[in-house]
From Swiss-Prot:
Belongs to the ribonuclease III family. It comes from Bacteroides fragilis (strain ATCC 25285 / DSM 2151 / CCUG 4856 / JCM 11019 / LMG 10263 / NCTC 9343 / Onslow / VPI 2553 / EN-2). It is found in: Cytoplasm. The gene is rnc. This is Ribonuclease 3. Its EC number is 3.1.26.3. SMART domains: DSRM (SM00358), RIBOc (SM00535). It is an enzyme of class 3 (hydrolase). Homodimer. It comes from the Bacteria.
Length: 290
């Protein structure tokens, strides 16, 4: 409280007080290092460079924010759902940190109006707002630390926009979404039960692997075949979206399997980008109230 009063007094003498006030309305506190928040909203399409000539955009902050957001949301979900199993907690967290939810949250708090990007660039994508939200979390972490990040998520995001209990009951069928993607892109997908064992309490545990054109995509465990398939499909969808080397291996395997493949000219890079955007659209088709 005292810190905020001191910040308000200092603000009166700053030339950029309008920017500070804008961030205060979103954060609930005044930034200490406002440059972090400004960079969090700087899309790579602007081609801005630092004094040393390095690209200046929000990608590094996005990387950091993604990791911090996973930890914070995991922390919140763990404390809220006492006694729930790991699979339940993982799925609930995934529903919050998925790209469509982050896109909506960015709009709700007004980040979409603050993002700087080049209108001449064609590099914009359907998850630019969500990326900026993650970068914003990274900025808060560097500026104020983990606890402040957690308070921001609890008070400014979860409480006003997300009903955790309602969200946890909403089922997301990752297997059907992966199959839908494979059909759109003419890819062969298989689900293989590779192990069945018992845990310490003699409950059956299943492990499933997903392969695309014979290439291992992801594996998942669960207390039923369905749960293990869902977890494996979820991991595979993330890999499709975020691992270009994996997708290159899949495309190569598709060609070797004599299935019509995309051209390997530079246009194929655009095809891979389109596939990744399709993944975001497919993963995000469920309606989550934020």
């Amino acid at each position: 409280m005292l810190r905020n009063k001191i910040d308000k007094i200092r603000l009166l003498f700053r030339k950029d007080r309008e920017s500070y006030s804008c961030f205060y309305r979103i954060l609930g506190f005044y930034p200490r290092n406002i440059r972090l928040y400004e960079q969090a909203l700087l899309h790579k399409s602007t081609a801005v460079r630092s004094e040393k000539g390095r690209p200046l955009n929000n990608e590094r902050l996005e990387f950091l924010g993604d990791a911090i957001l996973d930890a914070i949301v995991g922390d919140i979900v763990y404390q809220h759902f006492e006694g729930k199993r790991e699979g339940f907690l993982t799925n609930t967290r995934s529903k919050i940190v998925q790209r469509e939810t982050l896109n909506k949250l960015a709009v709700e708090i007004g980040l979409d109006k603050l993002i700087k990007y080049s209108t001449r660039s064609s590099s914009h994508n359907s998850y630019m707002y969500g990326n900026a939200f993650e970068a914003f979390i990274g900025a808060i972490y560097l500026d104020r630390g983990y606890e402040c990040c957690k308070q921001f998520m609890e008070r400014r995001i979860i409480e006003p926009y997300i009903d955790l209990d309602k969200l946890s009951r909403k089922e997301v069928n990752f297997k059907s979404k992966l199959i839908e993607w494979s059909q759109k892109n003419k890819m062969e997908v298989s689900f293989e039960l590779i192990e069945q064992s018992l845990d310490k309490e003699n409950n059956p545990v299943f492990q499933t692997e997903v392969r695309i054109e014979g290439i291992l995509g992801g594996s998942g465990t669960g207390y039923s075949k369905k749960e293990s398939q869902q977890n494996a499909a979820q991991m595979t969808l993330k890999k499709i979206k975020g691992d270009p080397e994996f997708m290159a291996s899949v495309q190569e395997a598709k060609t070797q399997n004599n299935v019509p493949a995309e051209d390997t000219t530079p246009e194929s890079e655009t095809s891979l980008t389109a596939e990744n955007q399709q993944i975001d659209e497919i993963i995000s088709t469920e309606e989550i109230s934020v």
